[in-house]
Amino acid sequence: MKPIYSLLVSGLVILTSWQAIEQAQALVPNIDSLQQVLIQETNPVKRLSLKRQIADLSMKTAKLEDRCRVFEDFTALVEEDVYMLNLREKDYLQHYYEYRLDEEGNRIEPHDSIKQKELYYTQEGLQIVELGEGVVELALSPAFFAKYLSQLPAHYQEYWQLSKDSENIAPDACLVLTWRELGDLIARYEAYAKAYPEQKELFVRLSDNYQYLQMVYMTGTDNTPVANESGALDPELKSEWQRFMKAYPNSLTTELIKEFLQRKNYSDLNAMQERVEEVQKTSNHPLLLASSSL
């Protein structure tokens, strides 16, 4: 009798367990149900949250080789909602600095309503980005993408980080990086090409950034010049070039530095820019060959 009783009890336990699992699964939204909710939702922030839930489920079921595609689709889709959010918050963004500065330019505490708004956006993975000339916009923060990036191959994670670190480095034509930070960023691009020589498609995407960074490093920007009014090279930049040559002797950028250090004067900016462009066009560096293959 006991064996039969035990079997009955075991059967009830298993049945109860399956019922609990089915109930739990019913409570967990699937991709189709989330997409149906998304179609009806008009609030950009709530749409971002729904798309994150869809991405969570998609990444769980995707094979490793497919996750990069899932992630790229996700990043494109969420940017649509960020664009709409910036339109919706146009008034707030246009008066962003007025909430923080008085008429004499002194810092003041924003109103509590502004603080609450900004706290809400921060919690939703958004941040304020300064674009220059008093213009700001809402953008997705690194934290928004962090958990997805951690599920991607190392080569893609580094590609993504390089791209992000190169964004908006000179608002108002004023370099926000130090010369050394810019030099090290260029070196990271060159190291990436050596570490992942098979990533030709990503080289194409990185090529324009690499050329721009190299151009700024060698010729400056309108508001961060490489030389003074008399054409003398900025001493800080000269020291940085010398450091870069020593740290990265085999770099294409080092070849440019060696040539530029032989110049007596740095007033002819057009000639310097043309020389950088000429070297970039004739170089066989993988990041530059990728550009010429387009």
Summary of predicted features, one role per range:
Residues 1-33:
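Bacterial Sec-dependent N-terminal signal peptides
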Residues 25-294:
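Acidic, polar-rich low-complexity tracts and alpha-helical solenoid repeat scaffolds
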